Amino acid sequence: MSKKITKRMQALLDKVDTQKVYDITTASVSVKSLASAKFDETVEVALKLGVDPRHADQMIRGAVVLPHGTGKKVRVAVFAKGVKADEAKAAGADVVGDDDLAEEIKNGNINFDIVIATPDMMALVGKVGRILGPKGLMPNPKTGTVTADVTKAVNNVKSGQVNFRVDKKGNIHAPVGKASFDAEKIKENVLELVKMINRLKPATAKGKYIRHAAISLTMSPSLELDAQELMDAR
């Protein structure tokens, strides 16, 4: 049985041509016209990559600092001691600690969106890995969240760093702004994300790298993007 389309969704579908393939400039304008919620909806990009994540060398994972941020206020927790803890606090980290922070996590007190750790703290972080991992909060060198440079890491996250990774089917979903953003800022954020993903293309990947791409709002239908245009972004 096909899912019934609501009046709200039908009204949005009437505004755009969902069968069309959009260039990123047009899509950035058109997706803004689909804002209909009572909150500032998130703009999200979905990419289907021509990779097989079952192979370690094709597990695409990374991070990029969007030029205009995501529009979301991010709470950051940092595992660090001594001078590094002081640096994290000075940089604006919301929660900083070591054993005490691990204890808070064990007790279910997770009031943050990103976790950063200095390398010497990873043994401790590993003890709460079963809790952080499923929530996507485990620090990782590939996303710049395991580092001795906590000042830079905190600044990047607060400035709009987006962490991404392919799922089992080769898909990447990432926020690239808010519906209230200017269309040009949405476009520039999308291109910055795609440029990073292009740089991470595995040498062993076969065929077309970006198989399908789409942009949407939290509560809107998606618009198909020109995958070739995105693959050409450098």
UniProtKB/Swiss-Prot annotation:
Gene Ontology biological process: regulation of translation; translation
Keyword Secreted belongs to the record: no
GO cellular component: cytosolic large ribosomal subunit
Keywords: Repressor, Ribonucleoprotein, Ribosomal protein, RNA-binding, rRNA-binding, Translation regulation, tRNA-binding
Signal peptide location: none
Entry GO MF terms: rRNA binding; structural constituent of ribosome; tRNA binding
InterPro entries: Ribosom_uL1_bac-type, Ribosomal_uL1, Ribosomal_uL1-like, Ribosomal_uL1/biogenesis, Ribosomal_uL1_3-a/b-sand, Ribosomal_uL1_CS
PROSITE patterns: RIBOSOMAL_L1
Protein task: Binds directly to 23S rRNA. The L1 stalk is quite mobile in the ribosome, and is involved in E site tRNA release. Protein L1 is also a translational repressor protein, it controls the translation of the L11 operon by binding to its mRNA.
PANTHER family assigned to the protein according to its UniProt record, in alphabetical order: 54S RIBOSOMAL PROTEIN L1, MITOCHONDRIAL (PTHR36427), LARGE RIBOSOMAL SUBUNIT PROTEIN UL1M (PTHR36427:SF3)
Subunit architecture: Part of the 50S ribosomal subunit.
Family: Belongs to the universal ribosomal protein uL1 family.
Protein name per its UniProtKB record: Large ribosomal subunit protein uL1
Source organism of the structure: Wolinella succinogenes (strain ATCC 29543 / DSM 1740 / CCUG 13145 / JCM 31913 / LMG 7466 / NCTC 11488 / FDC 602W) (Vibrio succinogenes)
